[in-house]
């Protein structure tokens, strides 16, 4: 009996062992910090990874269909994800809370435009918050605030939502049916800009003035909703036939009529220069209309550097250079340009100025002025070097003091063409005093004679070229006094060692303007450049004992002052 009982127990244990399922086929356990996969789905694999990393892993439906086999270690999850992405065609993103896995075919893209936040600020926000991923950079133009993003769907949605929230302005203040909106401008001025041009006061209207002028006369009641008058009632038929219905013109719906007249009515616009903002008061539709209008007008402008050269040359020297306004200019075998039949041309400015500098060393040319102006496209730049004389106007009972201003004035209004060339609206006024200096019989109250030369034109300059304007001739009288050193200053007899000479010549004045778009950051200032040169040459060494002593001495002086 005992033998039968023992045999039954042994058979029962053997049956239990045979029925119990094995973990090696259906549920492969995690061994240490790794995972052994055998034709498993990616969802199973990433569930095991989530268990080890203690981070949730979300796998899309398309990615979960793929199978994986192999022995994997989780000690470097980033490298493992990169390797799997290349081999299985996956894309992934980690936002600090969860890991998102997608199939490569699920990649999305979007184009976002920023108005109130620059692209650099938005990139810095993503980096500070830990949301930025170097595998999916934002590509765009910092000046215009428009960028392109491509990557996993969750990353693209996050970037678009974050950009929308950061760029979103205040919705305004609701006052019943009225609304007040605040619109901040980033690329233009909200108020008018005023500057003096000789005796004229020039005004460049701002955004507020431009919109007010646009809406002048729009304060009108709601227009007729029906597009035309209804037709007259048709006559009844005498024989009992049914008359046709009148063709009534289809009118607009009330909603369409209200939308069409939303821009009209009483809109209040105020410029606030402190923050360069525009305050708008009106209905919600009116405020939205002004907001869209401001968005279209407030665009970034490109910077333009204008280098001006005013050069006086002797007519004979200019002819020897080979300059002919109706032919060509040739300087050796380095410079050759063709000129049109007027007093304007484009040329390589650096080579022309090099030739002028060579003549200046021989005192055969004079660089009168060489200012450099920085402006923006569609913004005027003005250089004005003038002189003013005053004269009395005496009447029977009234006395007035009037003035006359003359000199050199250059006004340039640059803009960019579609092919990247710089087009300039150019106005030049060159005036000088033509009163003979040797005329000693002229009374004190006599008015001087002023000569003016005016040039007004529009020219387009290719990239890297300069604009040469002028070529007009004027007479120049120069008086030169030379003496023997020391002897020429002796009293009484000093005049014996001095001699004077008078020279009359024909001087040709030319204006060269070199426009250049500023794309890179501005160059460092002079002190920084000198310090860099000293460091590179070894003249500035941190091991120099004298410099260390001076630095310590100056630091002590600063501490004593504190």
From Swiss-Prot:
Pfam families: Secretin (PF00263), Secretin_N (PF03958), T3S_SPI-1_N0 (PF21304). The keyword Signal applies. InterPro entries: Bact_Secretion_Sys_Channel, NolW-like, NolW-like_sf, T2SS/T3SS_dom, T2SS_GspD_CS, T3S_SPI-1_N0, T3SS_OM_pore_YscC. Residues 1-24 form the signal peptide. Gene3D superfamilies: 3.30.1370.120, 3.55.50.30. Keywords: Cell outer membrane, Membrane, Protein transport, Signal, Translocation, Transport, Virulence. It is found in: Cell outer membrane. Disruption phenotype: Insertion mutants are hypoinvasive in the HEp-2 cell assay. GO terms for cellular component: cell outer membrane; type II protein secretion system complex; type III protein secretion system complex. One of its GO terms (molecular function) is identical protein binding. GO terms for biological process: protein secretion; protein secretion by the type III secretion system. NCBIfam families: type_III_yscC. The core secretion machinery of the T3SS is composed of approximately 20 different proteins, including cytoplasmic components, a base, an export apparatus and a needle. This subunit is part of the base, which anchors the injectisome in the bacterial cell envelope. Forms a stable homooligomeric complex. The complex is composed of 15 subunits. Belongs to the bacterial secretin family. T3SS SctC subfamily. Component of the type III secretion system (T3SS), also called injectisome, which is used to inject bacterial effector proteins into eukaryotic host cells. Forms a ring-shaped multimeric structure with an apparent central pore in the outer membrane. This is SPI-1 type 3 secretion system secretin. It comes from Salmonella typhimurium (strain LT2 / SGSC1412 / ATCC 700720).
């Amino acid at each position: 009996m005992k033998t039968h009982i023992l045999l039954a127990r042994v058979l029962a244990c053997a049956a239990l062992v045979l029925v119990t399922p094995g973990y090696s086929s259906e549920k492969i356990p995690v061994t240490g910090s790794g995972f052994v996969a055998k034709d498993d789905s990616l969802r199973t694999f990433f569930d095991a990874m989530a268990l080890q990393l203690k981070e949730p892993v979300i796998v899309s439906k398309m990615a979960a269909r793929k199978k994986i086999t192999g022995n994997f270690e989780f000690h470097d999850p980033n490298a493992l994800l990169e390797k799997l992405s290349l081999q299985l065609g996956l894309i992934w993103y980690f936002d600090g809370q969860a890991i998102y896995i997608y199939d490569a075919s699920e990649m999305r893209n979007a184009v976002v435009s920023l108005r109130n936040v620059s692209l650099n600020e938005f990139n810095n926000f993503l980096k500070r918050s830990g949301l930025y991923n170097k595998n999916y950079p934002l590509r765009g133009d910092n000046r215009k605030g428009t960028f392109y993003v491509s990557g996993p769907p969750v990353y693209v949605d996050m970037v678009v939502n974050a950009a929308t929230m950061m760029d979103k302005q205040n919705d305004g203040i609701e006052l019943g049916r009225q609304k007040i909106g605040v619109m901040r401008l980033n690329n233009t001025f909200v108020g008018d800009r005023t500057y003096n041009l000789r005796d004229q006061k020039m005004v460049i209207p701002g955004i507020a003035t431009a919109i007010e002028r646009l809406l002048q006369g729009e304060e009108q009641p709601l227009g007729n909703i029906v597009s035309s008058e209804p037709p007259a009632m048709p006559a009844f038929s005498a024989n009992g036939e049914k008359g046709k219905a009148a063709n009534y013109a289809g009118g607009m719906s009330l909603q369409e009529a209200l939308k069409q007249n939303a821009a009209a009515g009483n809109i209040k616009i105020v410029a606030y220069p402190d923050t360069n903002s525009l305050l708008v008061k009106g209905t919600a539709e009116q405020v939205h209309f002004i907001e869209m209008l401001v968005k279209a007008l407030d665009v970034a402008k490109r910077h333009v550097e204008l280098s001006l050269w005013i050069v006086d040359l002797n007519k004979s020297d200019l002819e020897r250079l080979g300059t002919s306004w109706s032919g060509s200019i040739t300087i050796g075998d380095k410079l050759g340009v063709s000129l049109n039949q007027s007093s304007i041309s484009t040329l390589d400015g650096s080579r022309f100025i090099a030739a002028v500098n060579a003549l200046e060393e021989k005192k055969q040319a004079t660089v009168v002025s060489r200012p450099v102006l920085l402006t923006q496209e569609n913004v005027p730049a003005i250089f004005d070097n003038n002189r003013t004389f005053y004269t009395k106007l005496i009447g029977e009972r009234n006395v007035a003091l009037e003035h006359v201003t003359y000199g050199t004035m250059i006004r340039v209004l640059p803009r960019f063409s579609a092919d990247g060339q710089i087009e300039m609206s150019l106005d030049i006024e060159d005036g000088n005093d033509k009163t003979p200096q040797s005329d000693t019989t002229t009374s004190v109250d006599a008015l001087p004679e002023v000569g003016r030369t005016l040039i007004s034109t529009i020219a387009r300059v290719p990239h890297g070229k300069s604009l040469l304007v002028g070529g007009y001739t004027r007479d120049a009288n120069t008086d030169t006094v030379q003496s023997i050193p020391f002897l020429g200053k002796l009293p009484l007899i000093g005049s014996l060692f001095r001699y004077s000479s008078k020279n009359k010549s024909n001087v040709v004045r030319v204006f060269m303007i070199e426009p250049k778009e500023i794309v890179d950051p501005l160059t460092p200032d002079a002190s920084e450049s000198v310090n860099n040169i000293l460091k590179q040459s070894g003249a500035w060494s941190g091991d120099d004992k004298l410099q260390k002593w001076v630095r310590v001495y100056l630091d002590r002086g600063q501490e004593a002052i504190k």
